[in-house]
Swiss-Prot record:
Its EC number is 3.5.1.88. This is Peptide deformylase. The gene is def. Keywords: Hydrolase, Iron, Metal-binding, Protein biosynthesis. The keyword ATP-binding does not apply.
Amino acid sequence: MAIRLIRTDDDPVLRKKSRVVDKIDSRIHTLLDDMIETMYEADGVGLAAPQVGILKQVIVIDVGEGVIELINPEIIKETGSQCDVEGCLSLPGHSGEVERPAIVKVRGLNRQGKMVEIQGTELLARALCHEIDHLNGILFTDKIIKE
């Protein structure tokens, strides 16, 4: 495992759409492992592959309940809304209030290639939406309603 460089600010990779992962192999496993180590080292709760310069649909999240790894994640259901302050490892020093769904259901693949569904509320819902936005070149600053 290795700590990877987190892309920041105006790095163009942060604005690009990520590609679907076709094959889950040792390279994807290494990417997941490195992303987890990088996220923990940076004291983050989530990290998307574009943040480490890889345009693949891969995210990792840990809001204190254990690590979640998702490949090709997609939001399949959103319920309600919540507003809270967000920050981002790729935008150090920036924060702002962002409206997100209160509850989300996300479908994706785990590292074994098995389809899984995760339902998140509160911080987990927010983190899932935030990291999936990264896969589409969207930053939380695009959605700030109040700084």
